């Protein structure tokens, strides 16, 4: 499909074409086959079953990539850095790395895509889509930051606490992302005052946010629109992190 952003028409008309195209594409996507495959591979997580049902996996993977493509196009309307991001650079292999795990089942039971202008291995904040029966979510943030980068982000939060609070405590953001971070220090990180009024924002071991969703979210015909709206509310958080990381680098 032609990328509407490269069609030489006026900006407003171009955006309208993208929206109409995405709505049509979303209607034609077979999202249920993604859930069918994931449920079946979860119940039959072995190579014999997988090899016998490779066609089902390929269909599920193709539909997930179609979904990601539509989401990328919609995100591009409010985040220009995402324009030109390719689906192949956002997805992950279905095969688990079992070398250091007691769980030797060979296949993942979810499909995920990380939409990031700098690549899925970047420290920068991106947009994550996760489909797993009973554990679907949308998420974003910066994961596993190197210690010096993490310290720089904490310093930016400390120095610009009013701006940061204005982002993460905004009702439009908080309705989808009520908590920042997943793992936390027990006390203030080294170099920051323990009595800082908003020390909870400095205790984060990673600056991430999660929006859990029922399976029905992705099965709904408007899931691309709703996903884009949720990520749009996340963008100021992403901008804060990415500006800080850019400045540090």
Language model regions located:
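Active-site acidic/histidine clusters and adjacent loop/turn architecture
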Residues: 39-92
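Hydrophobic/aromatic-rich structural module bridging two neighboring secondary-structure elements via a short loop
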Residues: 78-122
């Amino acid at each position: 499909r032609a990328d509407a952003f490269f069609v030489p028409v006026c900006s407003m008309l171009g955006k309208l074409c993208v929206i109409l195209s995405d709505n049509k594409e979303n209607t034609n996507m077979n999202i249920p086959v993604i859930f069918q495959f994931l449920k079946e591979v979860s119940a039959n997580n072995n190579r014999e079953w997988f090899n016998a049902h490779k066609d089902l996996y390929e269909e599920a993977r193709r539909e997930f990539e179609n979904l990601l493509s539509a989401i990328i196009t919609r995100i591009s309307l409010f985040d220009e850095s995402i324009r030109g991001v390719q689906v192949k650079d956002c997805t992950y292999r279905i095969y688990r790395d079992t070398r250091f795990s007691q769980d030797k089942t060979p296949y993942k039971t979810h499909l995920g895509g990380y939409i990031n202008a700098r690549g899925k291995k970047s420290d920068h904040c991106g947009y994550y889509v996760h489909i797993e029966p009973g554990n679907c979510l949308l998420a974003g943030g910066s994961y596993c930051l190197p210690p010096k980068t993490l310290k720089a982000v904490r310093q930016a939060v400390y120095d610009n606490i009013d701006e940061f609070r204005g982002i993460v405590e905004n009702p439009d953001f908080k309705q989808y992302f009520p908590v920042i971070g997943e793992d936390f220090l027990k006390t203030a990180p080294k170099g920051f005052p323990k009595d800082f009024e908003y020390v909870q924002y400095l205790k984060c071991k990673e600056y991430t946010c999660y929006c859990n969703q029922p399976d029905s979210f992705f099965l709904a015909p408007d899931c691309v629109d709703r996903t884009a709206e949720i990520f749009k509310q996340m963008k100021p958080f992403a901008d804060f992190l990415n500006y800080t990381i850019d400045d540090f680098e």
